[in-house]
Amino acid sequence: MVVTDGVVSLKHLVSMEILSNEEVLGLIKRGLAFKEKKVTFSLDRQYFAANLFFEASTRTHKSFEVAEKKLGLDVIEFDAKTSSVNKGETLYDTILTMSALGVDICVVRHSQDDYYKELIDSRTIQTSIVNGGDGSGQHPSQCLLDLMTIYDEFASFENLKIAIAGDITHSRVAKSNMQILKRLGAQIYFAGPKEWYSSEFDVYGKYVAIDDIINQIDVMMLLRVQHERHDGKESFSKKAYHQHYGLTEERYKQLKSSAIIMHPAPVNRDVEIADSLVEAPKSRIVAQMKNGVFVRMAILEAILRGKT
């Protein structure tokens, strides 16, 4: 990984842990430059990208596709339901095939934690891997668009009070964000059901009751309740969750005037956040979606630069 004149070069992007603070800020600023149309990018040859999503996705999948097309890449269609995966082909062999076909970048989402390790360690696979989410592990591109949204608002992370609230244990978004936000100087608070929190996160922040900090925080980062990872074992109703842990209209009124609300989406309305607040003045949920395209352009550009 290299940063030259503020522009990042990468071979892969599989985890936030592999990025230095300089690289993180470089990608954020490059994303903002794309957003503000201050830079252009041209390819030196034909490049191919494939988006391999083995879990459901709307925002990540389609924003990567838009980003790829904006940069001029040829996007290869892939549908897991009609691929040889249904004949028993492994993920490794699927990516090996893509590499053999000359695909330059594979964006992959998979239910297996750390699926990418055998791919980036392979001596045969030449395609670059961008992690679009691995199980309950990491989601680096979502993290970077979250960081871009915060940076665009506050121009710094130092001493910002950020609450990460909800289904923390099952959230790859939370795990990616807590690590890098702590490193960038933010103060992290965790809120939500105790059963969805682990003491391993104590090194990044403090577990608190949401009502104890609601009037102090700069960023309220809400997390989706991941029903698909609970096996139907939730101990409370959607209504009870909203009342005890969600962003209700009453809690919204207690937020600082400068505070912003974030959510990686999809949103469970009237669960994590009141339906009326999804597009409220303090909400940056739509801004996050928009920023996703531009920061993913920065990620893809960094990988393409790593190939030259």
UniProtKB/Swiss-Prot annotation:
UniProt keyword Transferase present: yes
GO molecular function: amino acid binding; aspartate carbamoyltransferase activity
Recorded metabolic or biological pathway in which this protein acts: Pyrimidine metabolism; UMP biosynthesis via de novo pathway; (S)-dihydroorotate from bicarbonate: step 2/3
Range of residues in the leader sequence: none
GO cellular component: cytosol
InterPro entries per record: Asp/Orn_carbamoyltranf_P-bd, Asp/Orn_carbamoylTrfase, Asp/Orn_carbamoylTrfase_sf, Asp_carbamoyltransf, Asp_carbamoyltransf_Asp/Orn-bd
Residues the entry annotates as binding L-aspartate: 87, 172, 224
Biological processes per GO annotation: 'de novo' pyrimidine nucleobase biosynthetic process; 'de novo' UMP biosynthetic process; amino acid metabolic process
Enzyme Commission numbers on file: 2.1.3.2
Keyword tags: Pyrimidine biosynthesis, Transferase
Stored Pfam families: OTCace, OTCace_N
Enzyme category, top tier: transferase
Catalysed conversion reaction: carbamoyl phosphate + L-aspartate = N-carbamoyl-L-aspartate + phosphate + H(+)
Positions annotated to bind carbamoyl phosphate: 59-60, 109, 139, 142, 265-266
Sequence intervals crossing the membrane: none
Family, as annotated: Belongs to the aspartate/ornithine carbamoyltransferase superfamily. ATCase family.
Function in brief: Catalyzes the condensation of carbamoyl phosphate and aspartate to form carbamoyl aspartate and inorganic phosphate, the committed step in the de novo pyrimidine nucleotide biosynthesis pathway.
Oligomer status and interactors: Heterododecamer (2C3:3R2) of six catalytic PyrB chains organized as two trimers (C3), and six regulatory PyrI chains organized as three dimers (R2).
Name of this protein: Aspartate carbamoyltransferase catalytic subunit
Record gene name: pyrB
